[in-house]
């Protein structure tokens, strides 16, 4: 019976004439010109045509992935084969992401609602036209609805970056550790006299973090850039006049409240309030194809959902945007940002401040640059950062927040005297040097006060060159210099050379000859990173550096080693470990750290930002031979020079497609290995010269 119902559902979908008619209307006159890297260049008469074709294009390059993301956003991923998503499904229901998406859909302006409808119409139309390209395991997800897109955006924002379940917390932490880079260089600092912009988010190379590159061309719009799969708009992009990128910031977007239970409710200001209780049943597919039911019972207070209960207390979670003033305008804001023609229009576009947890680094043809500490921070009624990062009393309304810090009160570095801005997921205070935004002028809960090694290296690269050429800009964007080495080797090497440990003395010679890079040919780099791991292991919870970081010397601290004896012992152990595993302690970085996909295998260049490396690659998949394959880091990379004509180059190292059998799964991997970018073609004439195929609607 179940199989028959499934077949009838698919028949209804594939013969759904009203949707087909809507699709044809939205798409009429639209073209997709696919270039030789699998990038869709969409030419349409209006935004709905763009949206339709973008949905179609995403299905063509990422169809099965997109449908898996829809299932996950519905909180129903556990229903499908080969899924292990029960924790994630439970988290989706706990946060009520679907319910918030339904409320958001009802609140969308007419134009964005039509955009969403056209986008999902394109998705569904592709599935009807190419059913053989849809995997059996995800076909039942169809059809996709507009609310699914908003639920997915909620999941990306609230269930991964601002808050995360047990399952996703490790992914979120790994992503934050790798971080993102952003640069904007004003004409006064550029050798050509034109503004330069670097877009460089670092995300895992799979699942909901997957990028797709595209171009939108319609009256009033000529936008190139990238979007995460299942986004109906370009999220990091540029037009002929301006561009922007995002880096996740240090805002505290969630709070934990301790509630005092009383009967079936909880106390607030001395009054017992009832919980809102909802029950959801998740169908979980078993290995034999049968299903079992898993029940999720969510108790929700005024603060948010209850996560734990014990001894008359409960722990409730408040997430900015979900529990408090709603944030339903992100899609409109991204669209308006892409249509802006100058700084004033762009500033007006971002004023609603609807994109949670994201900085905006901006540059334009007129020479303006900016680093805006964007996203949403509640106006907190009391306490400093440490107070709100702990568990807050939930029995008094005095700790509840009901409004957000307004746009005009958020930190912004605009057109600084230095001629450059940067962000590497550090707080807004050190976006440039000399510093122009001071933490003393803002609430203490707004941002942390620290600067990690990677953003220090970012600032160092920009500040070292008073006249940056295009080639230097690209070279510096691929820098693998390990700033950590500069801070600790001056203590480690003399101590190791004087040591009685033969392995440590030999290792010191290797590190002395090492180029302090994480390039593929850098001999000694694996030894250095293994040593740092060993050193940290020997000092759990203890100070690592002789001089800790301090904001009076933000670019020269931390420095030195707190315990040289432990460091020397760690070096001997690291040398022994690397030798046993790889045959030599001076093995090259690229011999251990690899770029692998679909049978291709290249030496890697780049490392984790923990080491102060600007070009970030994360190698978290360990192979049987002890080597590691890249699974994240530099994902979308684009460099733009706002010259006439505009010059741009980009890269998605893992390719612009995930569909099995697509040549565009691997055609950019060699470029990544060589530290190169591909050209961005924006004019029809350029695209026609590099045309793979053409589609008309």
Enumerate the language-model features and the residues they cover.
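Sec-dependent signal peptide recognition
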Residues: 2-8
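C-terminal/peripheral segments of proteins
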Residues: 23-503, 509, 513-697
């Amino acid at each position: 019976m179940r199989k028959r119902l499934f077949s009838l559902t698919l028949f209804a979908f594939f013969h759904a004439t009203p949707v087909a008619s809507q699709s044809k209307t939205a798409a009429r006159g639209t073209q997709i010109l696919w270039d030789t890297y699998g990038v869709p260049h969409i030419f349409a008469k209006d935004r709905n045509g763009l949206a339709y074709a973008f949905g179609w294009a995403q299905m063509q390059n990422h169809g099965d992935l997109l449908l898996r993301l829809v299932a996950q956003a519905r909180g129903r991923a556990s229903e499908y084969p080969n899924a292990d998503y029960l924790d994630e499904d439970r988290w989706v229901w706990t946060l009520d992401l679907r319910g918030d998406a339904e409320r958001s859909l009802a609140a969308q302006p007419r134009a964005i609602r039509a955009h969403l409808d056209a986008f999902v119409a394109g998705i569904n139309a592709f599935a009807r036209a190419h059913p053989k390209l849809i995997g059996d395991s995800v076909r039942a997800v169809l059809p996709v609805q507009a609310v699914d897109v908003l639920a997915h955006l909620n999941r990306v924002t609230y269930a991964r970056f601002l808050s995360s379940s047990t399952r996703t917390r490790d992914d979120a932490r790994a992503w934050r550790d790798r971080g993102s880079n952003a640069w904007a260089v004003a004409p006064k600092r550029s050798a050509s006299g034109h503004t330069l912009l670097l877009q460089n988010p670092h995300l895992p190379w799979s699942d909901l973090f997957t990028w797709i590159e595209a171009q939108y061309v319609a009256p009033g719009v000529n936008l190139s850039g990238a979007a995460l799969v299942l986004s109906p708009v370009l999220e990091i992009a540029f037009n002929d006049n301006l561009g922007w990128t995002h880096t996740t910031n240090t805002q505290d977007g969630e709070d934990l409240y301790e509630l005092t239970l009383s009967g079936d409710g909880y106390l607030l200001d001395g009054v017992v309030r009832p919980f809102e209780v909802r029950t959801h049943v998740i169908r979980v597919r078993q290995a034999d194809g049968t299903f079992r039911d898993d029940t999720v019972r969510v108790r929700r207070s005024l603060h948010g959902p209850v996560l734990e209960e014990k001894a008359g207390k409960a722990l409730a979670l408040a997430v900015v945007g979900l529990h408090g003033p709603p944030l339903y305008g992100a899609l409109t804001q991204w669209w308006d940002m892409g249509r802006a023609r100058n700084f004033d229009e762009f500033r007006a576009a971002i004023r609603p401040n609807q994109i949670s947890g994201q900085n905006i680094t901006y540059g334009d043809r007129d020479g303006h640059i900016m680093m805006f500490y964007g996203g949403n921070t509640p106006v907190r009624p009391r306490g400093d950062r440490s107070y709100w990062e702990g568990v807050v009393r939930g029995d008094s309304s005095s700790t509840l927040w009901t409004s957000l810090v307004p746009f005009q009160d958020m930190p912004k570095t605009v057109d600084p005297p230095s001629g450059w801005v940067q962000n590497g997921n550090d707080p807004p205070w050190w976006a440039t040097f000399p510093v122009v935004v001071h933490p003393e002028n803002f609430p203490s809960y707004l941002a942390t006060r620290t600067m990690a090694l990677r953003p220090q290296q970012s600032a160092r690269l920009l500040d070292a060159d008073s006249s940056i050429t295009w080639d230097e800009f690209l070279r510096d964007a691929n820098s693998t210099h390990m700033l950590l080495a500069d801070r600790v080797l001056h203590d480690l090497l003399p101590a190791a050379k004087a040591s009685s440990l033969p392995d440590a003395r030999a290792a010191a010679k290797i590190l002395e000859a090492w180029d302090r890079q994480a390039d593929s040919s850098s001999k000694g780099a694996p030894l250095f990173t293994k040593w740092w791991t060993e050193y940290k292991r020997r000092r759990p919870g203890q100070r690592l550096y002789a001089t800790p970081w301090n904001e009076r010397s933000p670019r020269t601290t931390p420095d030195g080693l707190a315990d040289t004896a432990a460091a020397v012992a760690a070096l001997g152990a690291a040398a022994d470990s690397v030798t046993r595993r790889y045959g030599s302690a001076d093995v090259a970085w690229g011999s251990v750290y690899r770029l692998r996909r679909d049978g291709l295998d290249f030496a890697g260049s780049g490392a984790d930002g923990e080491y102060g490396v600007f070009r970030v690659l994360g190698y978290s998949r360990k192979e049987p031979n002890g080597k590691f394959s890249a699974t994240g880091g530099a994902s979308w990379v684009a460099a733009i020079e706002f010259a006439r004509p505009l010059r741009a180059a980009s890269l998605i190292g893992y390719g612009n497609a995930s569909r099995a059998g697509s040549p565009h799964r691997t055609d950019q991997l060699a470029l990544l290995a060589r530290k190169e970018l591909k050209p961005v073609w924006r004019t029809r004439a350029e695209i026609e010269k590099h045309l793979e195929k053409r589609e008309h609607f």
